[in-house]
Amino acid sequence: MPLLVTSASGANGDGYGALLAFDDGGKPLGPFSDDDRIVDPRGLAPDPERRLLFLNSAERVLALDPAGEVARDSGVIAGLNPGGGIFGPDGRYYVGLRGARTVLALPPDLKRPGEHVLPPGVVPFPRGFGFGANGKLFLSSGIGPDGKGDDTIVAFSADRTRAVRLVDDPELSPLDLAVAPNGNVVVSSEHPFGALGAVTTVREYDPESGRLARVLSASGLAAFRRPRGLRFGADGNLYCAAQDEVVAFDFKAGRCLGPVVRLTRLHGQALAFFP
């Protein structure tokens, strides 16, 4: 199954500004789609039921078919400025909004307007989010391009009426968040954010107490600079997009397996296995 990675361009990274495909051995296959609506792409999430890949691109959301053709297009959504994207338990497609600093839920047909599921400005700078089995929404809050932020994870109740600061970890600066198969919250971290000598890790937290359960590091097996998007594979491994590579971790054993993709100037933002 091909591995797809969004590569940032412009002010956010000297990358390719494209959705790139790699084969099972990590060999680059070029852009998955040449559609000119794909501009400096960010989050992406597969919809296995419909065999579509949802992709956040500039001021719109696209859904691509297995051939890389655009099957659905939200049209321009003014001020979207999207970050990550995932499907929620209600079947809607959720998008992190970096400018509005909230999360938007869109219907999967992309034909109707979405709605904010959290108040605008709910965190200083959203960096990634995920849903727990009980409907909780976990939102990582990191440092923005202006250097401001609060480096934590906020947990919202299933009805979104209550919020608690879940994590107090002085060594955390989150870049993306995923909920692991064991229910724990997993975050890619670069601390201090943007620093030349930043410590890069994957950090795992208990979803109820916020207790730090484990810290995964590259252990010299990968450069692991500027870690960003996280994704669990069907093999149970955890994959993380980074500056010049995609790094795999044996999540059960808690050890790094090294890069599965190497590409100079990748500036990986998000990844998915599709179709």
Residue ranges and their predicted role:
Residues 27-36, 69-76, 112-120, 162-168, ...:
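A short beta-strand motif characteristic of beta-propeller blades
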Residues 1-30:
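An edge-strand/N-cap motif at the start of beta-rich repeat modules
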Residues 8-10, 56-58, 98-99, 142-144, ...:
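Short loop/turn segments immediately following the C-termini of beta-strands
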Residues 14-16, 35-50, 58, 77-93, ...:
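Beta-rich, blade/repeat-based domains predominating
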Residues 23-27, 64-69, 106-111, 156-161, ...:
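Short loop/turn segments that connect beta-strands within beta-propeller blades
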Residues 243-275:
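Blade-level signature of beta-propeller repeat domains, shared across WD40, Kelch, NHL, RCC1
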